[in-house]
Amino acid sequence: MDKVWWHTAWGLLCLLQLSLAQQQIDLNITCRYAGVFHVEKNGRYSISRTEAADLCEAFNTTLPTMAQMELALRKGFETCRYGFIEGHVVIPRIHPNAICAANNTGVYILLASNTSHYDTYCFNASAPLEEDCTSVTDLPNSFDGPVTITIVNRDGTRYSKKGEYRTHQEDIDASNIIDEDVSSGSTIEKSTPEGYILHTDLPTSQPTGDRDDAFFIGSTLATIATTPWVSAHTKQNQERTQWNPIHSNPEVLLQTTTRMTDIDRNSTSAHGENWTQEPQPPFNNHEYQDEEETPHATSTTWADPNSTTEEAATQKEKWFENEWQGKNPPTPSEDSHVTEGTTASAHNNHPSQRMTTQSQEDVSWTDFFDPISHPMGQGHQTESKGHSSGNQDSGVTTTSGPARRPQIPEWLIILASLLALALILAVCIAVNSRRRCGQKKKLVINSGNGTVEDRKPSELNGEASKSQEMVHLVNKEPTETPDQFMTADETRNLQSVDMKIGV
């Protein structure tokens, strides 16, 4: 019986922990630099665009602007986490790192959809201009709610309170759903109104650290910035050309995105566009350090009837796997989070390259991008393959993103846990009742003196004639009728009269 109650208590404890997990939020915050600080929720990318605004509002702050982020960067603020600001998703970087912002420095802008989940940055206008690491002890603008919100400061101090800060029901319902949207960039090309996207394969001229594998990222310059070009590339009469340099190492590729402004949009939209895709088998590289896989490579070709030069946009997305064979992409982390992004105030130095400075007003301009890793599993490879479409109006190559898989609702998980616990309790009660009902008891009638404990075992376990008696209780009902009772009474009366006469 004790074991049954122990299992019951253990099941209730597990159920309680499951319920509490749905009602706990940990907010890790950093020091403030010119009022800007970083907020991470539950140790992973789990904040939506709408929740980011609500969270900053709960801290009595706002989402920072790009100018405020650049000022914080100059004050020494840098992270390795993507976070929301006003209108963008960025990473502030001071020192180059191969796994942070594609080895770029400055405020690295990510071209990401608003449906993805990241961290967030907030701006406190009343904070000091320099670094401020005082502990945050309250969420002043939160309202009543059942959620336990814990603020974890940089020095490890923790402050908890009951409440809620989210104002959108979809953010509350999706609080425990891991974001599987890979629209953060590497395999999904966002349509850009500036012009066409021309992909060119180049050999890696300078491996970065131990990450000398092939990576892909598409970037654009948000402001006037220096843009490195490979010296082997030649441009004649500003015509769109296709060139394929020789790969010094077939396993080391670099994806370069070239954007060119279409001078004559009317002539382009007037003519048809032919799109072809040629799937190529993936290859493996066992030197890769992370848990990433190889998606299929696709080749897209566009032909213009009025142009003497054929444009070929070849997109080779090389993913490498070591031993990880899962079908779901890992959660974006500080070490591996890749997306098609934009570089603002970014600076990189590469040998054998010439630097060219151009602005957005130029007729044609090309960006050279550094590699960055992006985790993606095989489950998304088949979705992203062969779903490319041409937009004749804007002349932009767009690729549809992978659809999200349906998530199991939280209430269904809780209901299943309750049913399982009730079933376990019912089985335990049934087993215990069966044991009790099946027990046999012995009736011992002691015919001697003294209690049962005082008698010898031999007397109790001896013959039935000496130690036990069978007791039969017989309920005998009277069989005589009332008439018979009357006859007997009259007979007794007559006998009594005769005796009196005789006397």
Swiss-Prot record:
- UniProt main location, coarse: membrane
The residues on the Extracellular side of the membrane are: 22-410
Which of the residues bear the PTM Sulfotyrosine? Y288
Record's keyword annotation contains Cell cycle? no
Name the cystine pairs.
Answer: C31-C133, C56-C122, C80-C100
Residue positions, PTM Phosphoserine: S433, S447, S458, S467
Membrane topology per record? Single-pass type I membrane protein
> What are the glycosylated positions?
N28, N60, N103, N114, N124, S184, N266, N274, N306
| Stretches of the chain found on the membrane's Cytoplasmic side | 432-503
List residues binding hyaluronan. Answer: R44, R81, Y82, Y108
Q: Where is this region: Stem?
A: 228-410
Subunit text: Interacts with PKN2. Interacts with TIAM1 and TIAM2. Interacts with HA, as well as other glycosaminoglycans, collagen, laminin, and fibronectin via its N-terminal segment. Interacts with UNC119. Interacts with PDPN (via extracellular domain); this interaction is required for PDPN-mediated directional migration and regulation of lamellipodia extension/stabilization during cell spreading and migration. Interacts with RDX, EZR and MSN. Interacts with EGFR. Interacts with CD74; this complex is essential for the MIF-induced signaling cascade that results in B cell survival.
What name goes with this protein?
A: CD44 antigen
UniProt source species? Rattus norvegicus
The gene designation is Cd44
